[in-house]
From Swiss-Prot:
The chain crosses the membrane at residues 25-44, 83-103, 113-133, 145-165, 185-205, 207-227, 292-312, 328-348, 352-372, 375-395, 428-448, 452-472. One of its GO terms (cellular component) is membrane. Keywords: Membrane, Sugar transport, Transmembrane, Transmembrane helix, Transport. This is Putative glycerol-3-phosphate transporter 5. It is found in: Membrane. GO terms for molecular function: glucose 6-phosphate:phosphate antiporter activity. It comes from Arabidopsis thaliana (Mouse-ear cress). The keyword Transmembrane helix applies. It is a multi-pass membrane protein. Belongs to the major facilitator superfamily. Organophosphate:Pi antiporter (OPA) (TC 2.A.1.4) family. Its main location: membrane.
Length: 493
C-alpha cells in the first residue's frame, strides 16, 4: 500500500487509536464535519464585532452632528460613511483574496493553509481591539488592519468546503451541508453574544475574545484535521464511482454492489487528479449564474450582518430605543432564522433535486418578508422577532445552499470527471464573486442610510430581485427535467 500517512495531523501520532482500523470511516467523517464546523464558526464569530461596536464607535443618531460621543474618527457627521468604508476595506480584500486562496488551496496542503489563515485572522482581530487601549484614532490604522485581516479570512472558506467535499458524497449533500453550513449563523450568534456581553467593559474586549477563539480553533485544526479520506487509506467519496448501466444490466444489483463497497481501504492511491485553471472553472456549466446570484444574495445577507445591530439601536421598537447590548443580542434572531433557512433549503433541494428552483423560491418569498419587517417591525418586540426570524430564514436559505451544496456539486460535476482538486477553485469563484457583493452592500448601506432606512430596504429588495433573475434559466431547466421524469414514471406500467 502506498503510504499517505506522512502528512497526518499530530493527534494521530499522540493518539494511535484514532487511526484505522480502530476507528471507522463514519467516525472520521463526523470528526471532520465537527472540526470544520468549529473552524468556520470561529471565523464568523471574529467578523461580528465590527457590527456590534458600530453604535458605540459612530454618532449616537443619524442626524447627530455631535463629536462628544463615539470614537474618532467614526463619531462625526461622516461617521456612518466611514464605518461603511471600514466594512468595504475588509470585504473587498476578502473577495480579492478568495480567488487567490481557492487557486492555492487546490495546490498546497489544506490543513497548513487553513491554520495559517486562522492564526492570521485571530492576531489581526486582536490588533484591531488593541486600538481601544492604545487610544488610536487614525482611520488608516483601522483600515489597514481590516484589509490584511480580510486576506487571512479569505483562506478559510475554500479550505473547509474542499475538505468537506472530499469526505461527503453527493447523496444527501444538500441536507448534510445545510446542517453543516449553520456554522455561519452559529458563528454570527456566538460573535454577537460575546461582543455584546463585554461591550460595557470597553469595545476593545469585543474584538479580543473572538480573536482568541479563532486562535484556539486554529490549534484544534492543526492537531486533528484530516484533509482527505485517502490520508487514512479510505476511498474519497467526493470522487463518485461511476455505475455504468446498459439495457441488460440489473440496476438494483449494481446499486447494492456500489453501496456494499462503501468506504474501503485503498491498495493504491490515484494521484492523477489535477487542478483546473481559473478561467476554465468559470466556463463550467452553472458556475457563472450561481456566482452572480450569490453576488446579490450575499450583498443582502452581509448588509444585515454588518448593519442590523445599528439599525435596531436607532429604530424604536414599541416606542422604546434599545441599548447597545440589547440591540446586539436581538440581532442574533436573524441568524437563528438563518440556521433553519440553510437546513430547510438543503433538505428541500435534496427532495426535489432542484437547487436553482429552491433558491429562487426562497428569494421570491424574502421580498414580502423584508417589506413586512420594515413596515411592522417597530410595532412590538414580538412582531419584530417573528418577522426578523422569517427574514433571516428566507435570506440566508439560498445563500447557504449556494455556498455549500451547489458549490460542491459544481466542483465535482461530470464535465470535469469528478476532479476533486477543482473543488476549491470553483468554491472560491462562487464565494469570491459573492464576497464582492458582500463588500458593496454594507458600503452602500452606510451612504444610503443617511437618506433614511426605507432607501436601504429598497436597495435590498432590488438586489434580491436580480439574484433570482440569474437563476431563472436554470430553474426552468430543472422544472423541465422534473416534468420529463414524471412523464417517464407515468408511462411505466
Amino acid at each position: 500500500m502506498q503510504s499517505r500517512i506522512v502528512g497526518l495531523a499530530p493527534a494521530f501520532s499522540l493518539f494511535p487509536n484514532l487511526n484505522t482500523p480502530h476507528k471507522t470511516f463514519t467516525f472520521h467523517q463526523i470528526l471532520v464535519l465537527i472540526i470544520t464546523f468549529t473552524a468556520y464558526a470561529s471565523f464568523h464569530a471574529s467578523r461580528k464585532p465590527p457590527s456590534i461596536v458600530k453604535s458605540v464607535l459612530g454618532p449616537p443618531s443619524l442626524n447627530s452632528s455631535s463629536i462628544d460621543n463615539g470614537w474618532a474618527p467614526f463619531n462625526g457627521t461622516q461617521g456612518t460613511k466611514r464605518l461603511g468604508e471600514l466594512d468595504l476595506a475588509f470585504l473587498s480584500s476578502y473577495a480579492l483574496g478568495m480567488y487567490f486562496a481557492g487557486h492555492l488551496g487546490d495546490r498546497i496542503d489544506l490543513r497548513y493553509f487553513l491554520v495559517f489563515g486562522m492564526m492570521g485572522s485571530g492576531i489581526l482581530t486582536l490588533v484591531f481591539g488593541l486600538g481601544y487601549w492604545m487610544n488610536v484614532h487614525t482611520l488608516g490604522f483601522y483600515m489597514s488592519v481590516q484589509i490584511v485581516c480580510g486576506l487571512f479570512q479569505s483562506i478559510g472558506w475554500p479550505c473547509v468546503v474542499s475538505v468537506v467535499g472530499n469526505w461527503c458524497g453527493k447523496e444527501k449533500r444538500g441536507l448534510i451541508m445545510g446542517l453543516w453550513n449553520s456554522h455561519t449563523s452559529v458563528g454570527n450568534i456566538l460573535g454577537s453574544v460575546i461582543a455584546s456581553s463585554v461591550l460595557d467593559f470597553g469595545w476593545g474586549w469585543s474584538f479580543v475574545l473572538p480573536g482568541v477563539l479563532v486562535l484556539v480553533s486554529g490549534v484544534v485544526v492543526f492537531m486533528f484535521l484530516v484533509v482527505s479520506p485517502n490520508d487514512l487509506g479510505f476511498e474519497e467519496l467526493g470522487k463518485e464511482i461511476e455505475i455504468e448501466m446498459s439495457l441488460g444490466e440489473n440496476v438494483e444489483e449494481s446499486l447494492r454492489k456500489h453501496e456494499a463497497e462503501g468506504a474501503v481501504l485503498l491498495e493504491n492511491v490515484d494521484d492523477s487528479s489535477f487542478a483546473i485553471g481559473f478561467l476554465e472553472a468559470w466556463r463550467l456549466p452553472g458556475v457563472a449564474p450561481y456566482a452572480f446570484c450569490l453576488f446579490f444574495s450575499k450583498l443582502v445577507a452581509y448588509t444585515f450582518l454588518y448593519w442590523l445591530p445599528y439599525y435596531l439601536r436607532h429604530t424604536a421598537v414599541a416606542g422604546v430605543n434599545l441599548s447597545h447590548k440589547t440591540a446586539g443580542i436581538l440581532s442574533t434572531v436573524f441568524d437563528v432564522g438563518g440556521v433553519l433557512g440553510g437546513i430547510s433549503a438543503g433538505f428541500i433541494s435534496d427532495k426535489i433535486k432542484a437547487r436553482a428552483l429552491t433558491s429562487i423560491t426562497f428569494l421570491a418569498l424574502s421580498i414580502p418578508a423584508l417589506i413586512m419587517y420594515r413596515v411592522y417591525g417597530s410595532v412590538s418586540m414580538f412582531i419584530n422577532i417573528v418577522l426578523m426570524f422569517i427574514s433571516g430564514l428566507l435570506v440566508n436559505g439560498p445563500y447557504a445552499l449556494i455556498t455549500t451544496a451547489v458549490a460542491a456539486d459544481l466542483g465535482t460535476q461530470d464535465s470535469i470527471k469528478g476532479n476533486g482538486r477543482a473543488l476549491a477553485t470553483v468554491t472560491a469563484i462562487i464565494d469570491g464573486t459573492g464576497s464582492v457583493g458582500a463588500a458593496l452592500g454594507p458600503l452602500l448601506a452606510g451612504y444610503i442610510s443617511s437618506r433614511g432606512w426605507n432607501s436601504v430596504f429598497f436597495m435590498l429588495i432590488v438586489s434580491i430581485f436580480f439574484a433570482g433573475l440569474f437563476l431563472v434559466r436554470l430553474a426552468k431547466s430543472e422544472i423541465n427535467t422534473m416534468r420529463s421524469g414524471e412523464l417517464i414514471a407515468s408511462s411505466v406500467p
